[in-house]
Amino acid sequence: MMTHWPSPAKLNLFLYITGQRADGYHTLQTLFQFLDYGDTLHIEPRHDGEIHLLTPVNGVENEDNLIVRAARLLMKVASESGRLPAGSGADISIEKRLPMGGGLGGGSSNAATVLVALNHLWQCGLSIDELATLGLTLGADVPVFVRGHAAFAEGVGEILTPVNPPEKWYLVAPPGVSLPTPVIFKDPQLPRNTPKRSIDTLLKCEFSNDCEVIARKRFREVDAALSWLLEYAPSRLTGTGACVFAEFDTESCARQVLEQAPEWLNAFVAKGVNLSPLHRELL
């Protein structure tokens, strides 16, 4: 029985803000691709109906952690529909590699891995569509991790179309700051009316991120990291930050630049993949 579950990072290869709804949420167009790099969740089934998170996060109550919330949500929905075997529970721990507030999707990926893994381990039998719907109640980025394929996203990120962008190599640089998403979306200078374009058009254009100008303005660490990367390769912000990345055609090129990275830049090299490492393990 599989007890080690990948919880991969994602990159937003581009991100455009196309509007703002009456409820305050921003509409967007973005391209998600996974990395062959991320956290690992260790999940051992229990038979007493309890959920235990063995690796708590400082400053976050276990019951508020997305990992526990995802487990309890699946437990509730499966139980209410008569698909939860009696006594289903789990001990969950995490090997954390992804920074919090980094724009790599760490928390959303963790939640998705819990939904997919426990659905498998508990043999609940929920479909991917059902799991993705549950995931959306936990966060806008959770469904793409549940579905496990690179995707073009619209709406608030919930309308997903599978795509297959080139699987390049990336040097990813966490600048050492956590960048709260509301800081970006509340900034009055954030571009909010980028014209909507078709997938085909966007894939042919040079990629960019509407949030980047705000992140660079508000956080000097982001600006410094991106300025350094841009000396070597096309580079952008992922999500709302704070991580930035540079793209390369080969692993060796990416690693040559990594060797020159300043000590304050805690960078790593990873490959972009269109099939999530989580779903690859399930094949």
UniProtKB/Swiss-Prot annotation:
Q: What does the record note on quaternary structure?
A: Homodimer.
Q: What EC number(s) does this enzyme carry? A: 2.7.1.148
Reactions catalysed, semicolon-separated, are: 4-CDP-2-C-methyl-D-erythritol + ATP = 4-CDP-2-C-methyl-D-erythritol 2-phosphate + ADP + H(+)
Q: Which Pfam families does the record associate with it?
A: GHMP_kinases_C, GHMP_kinases_N
Give the InterPro entries listed for this entry.
Answer: GHMP_kinase_C_dom (IPR013750), GHMP_kinase_C_sf (IPR036554), GHMP_kinase_N_dom (IPR006204), IspE (IPR004424), Ribosomal_Su5_D2-typ_SF (IPR020568), Ribsml_uS5_D2-typ_fold_subgr (IPR014721)
Source organism per UniProt: Salmonella choleraesuis (strain SC-B67)
Give the gene name: ispE
Q: What is this protein called?
A: 4-diphosphocytidyl-2-C-methyl-D-erythritol kinase
Question: Where along this sequence does the record place binding of ATP?
Answer: P99, M100, G101, G102, G103, L104, G105, G106, G107, S108, S109
The record's listing under PANTHER family reads: 4-DIPHOSPHOCYTIDYL-2-C-METHYL-D-ERYTHRITOL KINASE, CHLOROPLASTIC
Pathway the protein contributes to: Isoprenoid biosynthesis; isopentenyl diphosphate biosynthesis via DXP pathway; isopentenyl diphosphate from 1-deoxy-D-xylulose 5-phosphate: step 3/6
Instruction: Provide the active-site residues from the annotation.
Output: K10, D141
Reported function: Catalyzes the phosphorylation of the position 2 hydroxy group of 4-diphosphocytidyl-2C-methyl-D-erythritol.
Q: Name one GO biological process term.
A: isopentenyl diphosphate biosynthetic process, methylerythritol 4-phosphate pathway
This protein's UniProt keywords: ATP-binding, Isoprene biosynthesis, Kinase, Nucleotide-binding, Transferase
UniProt key word Kinase: yes
Task: Family membership, please give it.
Answer: Belongs to the GHMP kinase family. IspE subfamily.
The Gene Ontology terms for molecular function here are:
4-(cytidine 5'-diphospho)-2-C-methyl-D-erythritol kinase activity; ATP binding
